[in-house]
Amino acid sequence: MEKYILSIDQGTTSSRAILFNQKGEIAGVAQREFKQYFPQSGWVEHDANEIWTSVLAVMTEVINENDVRADQIAGIGITNQRETTVVWDKHTGRPIYHAIVWQSRQTQSICSELKQQGYEQTFRDKTGLLLDPYFAGTKVKWILDNVEGAREKAENGDLLFGTIDTWLVWKLSGKAAHITDYSNASRTLMFNIHDLEWDDELLELLTVPKNMLPEVKPSSEVYGKTIDYHFYGQEVPIAGVAGDQQAALFGQACFERGDVKNTYGTGGFMLMNTGDKAVKSESGLLTTIAYGIDGKVNYALEGSIFVSGSAIQWLRDGLRMINSAPQSESYATRVDSTEGVYVVPAFVGLGTPYWDSEARGAIFGLTRGTEKEHFIRATLESLCYQTRDVMEAMSKDSGIDVQSLRVDGGAVKNNFIMQFQADIVNTSVERPEIQETTALGAAYLAGLAVGFWESKDDIAKNWKLEEKFDPKMDEGEREKLYRGWKKAVEATQVFKTE
């Protein structure tokens, strides 16, 4: 009887369940979208119960549709949209407010106040993060401050906090396990990434009671078992957890110091494994925990690009220049260059290494000879320039020259982007056969804990190259193009909203 690992990939817009066999191949997929709530400008929320219902639905569907029995599931791994915050009543199991999503800016005033009080460096030193609404800590404070009776309930020990991984493990285990893993804890602004403990000083600054917080565990461990009524009468080990970007790093078998993966999703995320050393960034990168396994943690440097694949969606839905995302490649390759056109897609500001929330998108270098093809090509190239910005910051902070770049996410199917990426960073770009690396990473973590895979070496053998893109551009051309990009970014920052 063939066994599988079930991976739950709980994302920002949908929940997916994917079955993996021992070779790390996909044996079945189910997906379900859920509703986004926008109660005010800049606020983004989810209904945590809707997320839970969607997860139950995809788990059921992937098992039924692929004629797999529940007793063929050796373990469950969970990967999740990071930072999204749930606070619930531990007796009733009901959330006391919507889940506040990572994108939501509703805690901006809390962050500003803490900065004015001079605590920014304290948070940076202990957590490796910026004092930004992006992270979970200020979201918990906001819920306790704004939901009637919440703070009193929290002080009395009646409320629990969790990121989405914690919420799902708690529900799946029938309320038995209130846990998170090192990678998710490191995104909360409340966890000391050096001591590997919840930090009392930070909790005091955020006025969050410690009794609400989950126990922090390794990313690969049996945390508990599914309660039988949620899983066809079976008690299946819940055995792996990691935040989405860290799971992708693991799924790409980036186990060695200096290994790098880049995800081209709606936004872009680059992570470098820095081994057992938490590298302090001087270049606007985040220092975070990659994963905890075998009794130790691996750290990572992370760079965030706010607009990556969503720039292609903009060409399709906003400007109607293309009918489908793949069409962008054929337009881009009809011309040999952009003829000096640069698109800076700072639609929601600029991420790493600039961290400029006031910047807005801009186009430079237009002439009467500029055609649609030049514009589309310039938009695709912007994904690659932004990646070089992040990679240079990583090399500078870590002292490691990146030897190859493993890639995943929707935009990696675009061969033009992959080749231009290799050219502009002067590094080989490696596209794997299995591009569901986030779900695969969670599966690997769970599989290691239950003996489905023996070791990381076992997993590394599963990684297979689909195509390698080597740099072909000469040095002079590469640097000239990149200088133009830097100039365009600088000009974009000059032209800010008032």
From Swiss-Prot:
Short name of any one Pfam family annotated for the protein: FGGY_C
Recite the UniProt keywords alphabetically.
ATP-binding, Glycerol metabolism, Kinase, Nucleotide-binding, Phosphoprotein, Transferase
One of its GO biological process terms is:
glycerol metabolic process
Q: In which pathway does it act?
A: Polyol metabolism; glycerol degradation via glycerol kinase pathway; sn-glycerol 3-phosphate from glycerol: step 1/1
Q: Which residues bind sn-glycerol 3-phosphate?
A: 12, 82-83, 134, 244
- According to UniProt, the name of this protein is Glycerol kinase
Provide the record's note on post-translational modification.
Answer: The phosphoenolpyruvate-dependent sugar phosphotransferase system (PTS), including enzyme I, and histidine-containing protein (HPr) are required for the phosphorylation, which leads to the activation of the enzyme.
Name the family the entry cites. Answer: Belongs to the FGGY kinase family.
Species classification: Bacteria, Bacillati, Bacillota, Bacilli, Bacillales
Q: Give the residues the record marks as binding glycerol.
A: 82-83, 134, 244-245
Report the PANTHER family cross-referenced here.
Answer: GLYCEROL KINASE, SUGAR KINASE
Provide the function of this protein: Key enzyme in the regulation of glycerol uptake and metabolism. Catalyzes the phosphorylation of glycerol to yield sn-glycerol 3-phosphate.
Cite the binding residues for ATP: 12-14, 266, 309, 313, 410
The protein's matches in InterPro entries, at most eight in alphabetical order, are given as: ATPase_NBD, Carb_kinase_FGGY, Carb_kinase_FGGY_CS, FGGY_C, FGGY_N, Glycerol_kin
Assembly with partners or alone: Homotetramer and homodimer (in equilibrium).
Phosphohistidine is found on 230
The enzyme's E.C. designation: 2.7.1.30
Give the species: Staphylococcus aureus (strain MRSA252)
GO cellular component, alphabetical, reads: cytosol
